[in-house]
Amino acid sequence: MIPYRALCSNIQFAKHVLPELNNQTNVVAMLPSAHMYGMMFEFLFEMTIGAHVHFLTRVPSPKIIMQALAEVKPNIIIAVPLIIEKVYKSKIQKIVEKGSVKTLLKVPVIDKMIQKKICGELVSAFGGNFVEVIMGGAAFNKEIEKFFWDIAFPYTVGYGMTECAPIIT
């Protein structure tokens, strides 16, 4: 049994680190509510700030998720790494692996301009209106994580377990 104080602690932490989220916030709920991670950060936290939660009514395939993100334009995205990796692979990876782009990403000054453009494309792919993508529930691909770090993509990888309601870090 998860104690109330553990749930409350997670909610207080989320309010502290994401003060910009409020009753105007939109969230697409794509994780199973039967799991603590989805229940906490796509439902309970949002209820305490009065946010608008948009539940997917179909199995969350990449196509359905992308349609929902484009339509809702969420202010925060809560996901497992696999979802984020699939979006990266379908929207960005082909661009980054082109020979000319690979070469230009090694040229000082030009690399920053290209990284900024790529980051903008990735942000647009996720609806273009979010403050952060928060991932947890599984390991995040190290190569993609390094790439996200390099382009200054706004993301956080959390660690937790259900017994901790669910976040630890």
Over which residues does each language-model region extend?
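Extended hydrophobic secondary-structure segments that form protein cores and membrane-embedded regions
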Residues: N26-M30, E132-I134
